[in-house]
Amino acid sequence: MGRPWTSILTLGTVNLWMHSLFSDISVSLNEKLVSPPTSMYPYRAYLETLPRYGPATKDSQLTGVVWYRHTRIHGQQGKKENKGFGERLALIAESKLVQMMRKLHLDLFCQEKYLLNQVEMKIKLRRSRDVFALMGVTDKIKDISLFVRKVQLSPNIRMGHVKALEKISSKFPIRKVEVKVDTVPQGNTNYDW
């Protein structure tokens, strides 16, 4: 992978490709929006993923979302010498199918509690512009699957939920995370948030 790539291979992906494919993701529970859409989803995924994991995890588990470390050979410029780009390029060369699997970075999915039965969940994924997720000129997504874990509770626990819901409604505290854009002028050494 250390040799320069030929000019025939012109399409590669950015790092953390799975999360870069979507500009925003919204979640509704029983028709109530709990994770509003925002164009900051890929940035949130980067900020929650990269500082959290060390090099060993990035080089193993994060390859499931197409993370390959950028490298440059000293004194050379461009994508052709970047080993990480070469790895990602080889994954999709000749229109190969790529399977990626990782959790979505949304407030609801960072909670430790399960949803109750009969709660309708809608997830809307909006695609990013190609120039944001791809390093090249063309692309096509063939198929996307969303895997959801389902937990089977014991009958005693379900009955306890039913009895509790007869007296009060359920409330789920959700920890909210906001990602905002701001501009820092060039040469500015102080920044107040």
Model-derived features: positions:
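Short, low-complexity Pro/Thr/Gly
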Residues: 1-193
